[in-house]
């Protein structure tokens, strides 16, 4: 069905007169600077369609143009024509290939701003993803006169009730909060024709499935249901058979892991991980990085260690207050800080295009988590680097994840080539417009919200020079197994010791400009 529609659109090209008419509406609109970074085939291998070929509203086209969207990606080419017909869709595509716009554009097109009823509900698993998705809706629909509301847990219910007293056309939120509003009769979903689930594999986990099914009960029976994710476990098939009407299935996953992301591992003892991380910071040319830990306690501890080493760092995890998490996410996305330490809170759908390095300080336990983590780099087909710090206990997970994903994670080489993850003009990376910028070097208290040290950085996000600005550093490749004769390494003590006192009682002094020689041998 999609191929017939898209092929017909591709063959129906506009006349020169029509093309000149279309160009007129662009007058007075300001498109952002073009992103000149190279892209991989999963976003460039299109059928040659333009957004104009979908025959969507002129006002929506204006928002798409001002957002900097040039041509639809493959997932957008496949999804938008079918979604505009109102058919149910089950779409599987890689992280960072344009899934959000694939469902936001047809959703905006089908909403009638003259009807003061909620006409679309977009469910996401996390608060950060809800904020990001709602912003995409507002950006693309800025000329449509559509009201978009984001509603998540962790904020006051009273504020949501007040906002719903005015017309809201699209609600973006997490399942629990939306069910609360619908159950109280505050959110009227009786005329909500579009039901979208992003990161559907997470939303259909045992934690969320009962809530999602209850929410569907508030919708009309002829609603359109669209599910999007990078992975579809068996629970998705069960939901499809029960709640979807002959959905059109789209699968663009010729391989699970993202093209354009180079994956390495370094075998290090637990107590040496911080030193290894310090080496990576000194040797890699990092624009922005996300560092993952497996627990909230380790997130805070590692963030503190990183600031002690003299690097700028934020942290975020699920136990933080929501307004603090929002502030960290907003500032990091706007380039205020180079490094973010977090738990798996930010593995789902978060799109920060400036991130070119992901480091698994703690190796994930399963392939699904690994896939979503490394997908935070290399967004929308750009290049990225994923480095995994592996200890003795992680080796079995490493082998299993390689087998399940059909990929090979290579030992870290002595030299990591810049062309694998570095681009020439970081100042041209698309960033959201920040309403306020902090002054260079500004410190914020370490109150459990953020840990910052902007020393040597441009707070506007143009990270040229300063810490982490070196490139092509020397790394000692690590073996998966310990060297012969050493046996199993001893269990490390926590995260390693930074600035430990010497045996004679004197504090070890560190030269901030010292270049470590490489990760220690396991």
UniProtKB/Swiss-Prot annotation:
<dbReference type="GO" id="GO:0010494">
    <property type="term" value="C:cytoplasmic stress granule"/>
</dbReference>
<dbReference type="InterPro" id="IPR027417">
    <property type="entry name" value="P-loop_NTPase"/>
</dbReference>
<keyword id="KW-0810">Translation regulation</keyword>
<feature type="short sequence motif" description="Q motif">
    <location>
        <begin position="49"/>
        <end position="77"/>
    </location>
</feature>
<feature type="compositionally biased region" description="Gly residues">
    <location>
        <begin position="463"/>
        <end position="475"/>
    </location>
</feature>
<dbReference type="GO" id="GO:0003724">
    <property type="term" value="F:RNA helicase activity"/>
</dbReference>
<dbReference type="GO" id="GO:0016887">
    <property type="term" value="F:ATP hydrolysis activity"/>
</dbReference>
<dbReference type="InterPro" id="IPR014014">
    <property type="entry name" value="RNA_helicase_DEAD_Q_motif"/>
</dbReference>
<feature type="region of interest" description="Disordered">
    <location>
        <begin position="427"/>
        <end position="522"/>
    </location>
</feature>
<feature type="domain" description="Helicase ATP-binding">
    <location>
        <begin position="80"/>
        <end position="250"/>
    </location>
</feature>
<keyword id="KW-0963">Cytoplasm</keyword>
<dbReference type="GO" id="GO:0003729">
    <property type="term" value="F:mRNA binding"/>
</dbReference>
<keyword id="KW-0347">Helicase</keyword>
<keyword id="KW-0509">mRNA transport</keyword>
<keyword id="KW-0507">mRNA processing</keyword>
<dbReference type="GO" id="GO:0034063">
    <property type="term" value="P:stress granule assembly"/>
</dbReference>
<feature type="short sequence motif" description="DEAD box">
    <location>
        <begin position="198"/>
        <end position="201"/>
    </location>
</feature>
<comment type="similarity">
    <text>Belongs to the DEAD box helicase family. DDX6/DHH1 subfamily.</text>
</comment>
<dbReference type="GO" id="GO:0000932">
    <property type="term" value="C:P-body"/>
</dbReference>
<keyword id="KW-0547">Nucleotide-binding</keyword>
<keyword id="KW-0694">RNA-binding</keyword>
<dbReference type="Pfam" id="PF00271">
    <property type="entry name" value="Helicase_C"/>
</dbReference>
<feature type="binding site">
    <location>
        <begin position="93"/>
        <end position="100"/>
    </location>
    <ligand>
        <name>ATP</name>
    </ligand>
</feature>
<feature type="domain" description="Helicase C-terminal">
    <location>
        <begin position="260"/>
        <end position="420"/>
    </location>
</feature>
<dbReference type="GO" id="GO:0005524">
    <property type="term" value="F:ATP binding"/>
</dbReference>
<feature type="compositionally biased region" description="Low complexity">
    <location>
        <begin position="430"/>
        <end position="446"/>
    </location>
</feature>
<dbReference type="Pfam" id="PF00270">
    <property type="entry name" value="DEAD"/>
</dbReference>
<dbReference type="InterPro" id="IPR011545">
    <property type="entry name" value="DEAD/DEAH_box_helicase_dom"/>
</dbReference>
<dbReference type="GO" id="GO:0033962">
    <property type="term" value="P:P-body assembly"/>
</dbReference>
<keyword id="KW-0378">Hydrolase</keyword>
<feature type="compositionally biased region" description="Low complexity">
    <location>
        <begin position="487"/>
        <end position="516"/>
    </location>
</feature>
<comment type="function">
    <text>ATP-dependent RNA helicase involved in mRNA turnover, and more specifically in mRNA decapping. Is involved in G1/S DNA-damage checkpoint recovery, probably through the regulation of the translational status of a subset of mRNAs. May also have a role in translation and mRNA nuclear export.</text>
</comment>
<dbReference type="InterPro" id="IPR000629">
    <property type="entry name" value="RNA-helicase_DEAD-box_CS"/>
</dbReference>
<dbReference type="GO" id="GO:0006397">
    <property type="term" value="P:mRNA processing"/>
</dbReference>
<dbReference type="GO" id="GO:0051028">
    <property type="term" value="P:mRNA transport"/>
</dbReference>
<dbReference type="InterPro" id="IPR001650">
    <property type="entry name" value="Helicase_C-like"/>
</dbReference>
<protein>
    <recommendedName>
        <fullName>ATP-dependent RNA helicase DHH1</fullName>
        <ecNumber>3.6.4.13</ecNumber>
    </recommendedName>
</protein>
<keyword id="KW-0067">ATP-binding</keyword>
<dbReference type="InterPro" id="IPR014001">
    <property type="entry name" value="Helicase_ATP-bd"/>
</dbReference>
<dbReference type="GO" id="GO:0017148">
    <property type="term" value="P:negative regulation of translation"/>
</dbReference>
<feature type="compositionally biased region" description="Low complexity">
    <location>
        <begin position="453"/>
        <end position="462"/>
    </location>
</feature>
<keyword id="KW-0813">Transport</keyword>
């Amino acid at each position: 069905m999609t191929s017939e529609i898209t092929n017909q659109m591709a063959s129906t090209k506009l006349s020169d007169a029509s093309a000149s008419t279309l160009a007129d509406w662009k007058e007075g609109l300001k498109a952002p600077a073009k992103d000149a970074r190279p892209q991989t085939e999963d976003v460039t291998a299109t059928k040659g369609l333009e957004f104009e070929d979908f025959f969507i509203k002129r006002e929506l086209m204006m928002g798409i143009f001002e957002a900097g969207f040039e041509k639809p990606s493959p997932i957008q080419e496949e999804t938008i024509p079918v979604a505009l017909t109102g058919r149910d869709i089950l779409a599987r595509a890689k992280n960072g290939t344009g899934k959000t716009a694939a469902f936001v554009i047809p959703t905006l097109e089908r909403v009638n701003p003259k009807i003061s009823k909620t006409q679309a509900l977009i469910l996401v698993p996390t608060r950060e993803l809800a904020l990001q998705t709602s912003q995409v809706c507002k950006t693309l629909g800025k000329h449509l006169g559509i009201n978009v509301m984001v509603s998540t847990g962790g904020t006051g219910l009273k504020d949501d009730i007040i906002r719903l007293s005015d017309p809201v056309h699209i609600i973006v939120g997490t399942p629990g909060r939306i069910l609360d509003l619908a159950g109280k009769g505050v959110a009227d979903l009786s005329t909500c024709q579009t039901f979208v689930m992003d990161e559907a594999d997470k939303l259909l986990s045992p934690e969320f499935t009962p809530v999602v099914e209850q929410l569907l009960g508030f919708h009309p029976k002829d609603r359109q249901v669209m599910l999007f994710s990078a992975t579809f476990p068996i629970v998705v098939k069960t939901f499809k058979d029960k709640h979807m009407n002959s959905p059109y299935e789209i699968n663009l996953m010729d391989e699970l892991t993202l093209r354009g992301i180079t994956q390495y591992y370094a075998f290090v003892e637990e107590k040496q991980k911080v030193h290894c991380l310090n080496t990576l910071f000194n040797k890699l040319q990092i624009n922005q990085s996300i560092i993952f830990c497996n627990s909230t306690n380790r997130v805070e501890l590692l963030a503190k260690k990183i600031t002690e080493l003299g690097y700028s760092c934020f942290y975020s995890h699920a136990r933080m207050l929501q307004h603090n998490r929002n502030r960290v996410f907003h500032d990091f996305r706007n380039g205020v800080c180079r490094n973010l330490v977090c738990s798996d809170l930010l593995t789902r759908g978060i799109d920060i295009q400036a991130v070119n390095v992901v480091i698994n300080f703690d190796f994930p336990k399963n392939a699904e988590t690994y896939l979503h983590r490394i997908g935070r780099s290399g967004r929308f087909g750009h290049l990225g680097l994923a480095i995994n710090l592996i200890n003795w206990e992680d080796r079995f997970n490493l082998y299993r994840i390689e087998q399940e994903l059909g990929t090979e994670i290579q030992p870290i080489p002595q030299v990591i080539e810049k062309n694998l993850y570095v681009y020439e003009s970081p100042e041209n990376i698309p960033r959201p417009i920040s309403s306020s910028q902090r002054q260079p070097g500004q410190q914020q208290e370490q109150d459990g919200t953020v840990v910052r040290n902007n020393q040597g950085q441009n707070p506007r996000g143009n990270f040229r020079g300063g810490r982490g600005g070196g490139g092509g550093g020397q790394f000692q490749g690590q073996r998966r197994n310990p060297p012969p004769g050493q046996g199993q390494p001893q269990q490390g003590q926590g995260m390693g010791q930074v600035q430990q006192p010497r045996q004679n009682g004197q504090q070890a002094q560190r030269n901030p400009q010292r270049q470590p020689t490489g990760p220690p041998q396991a």
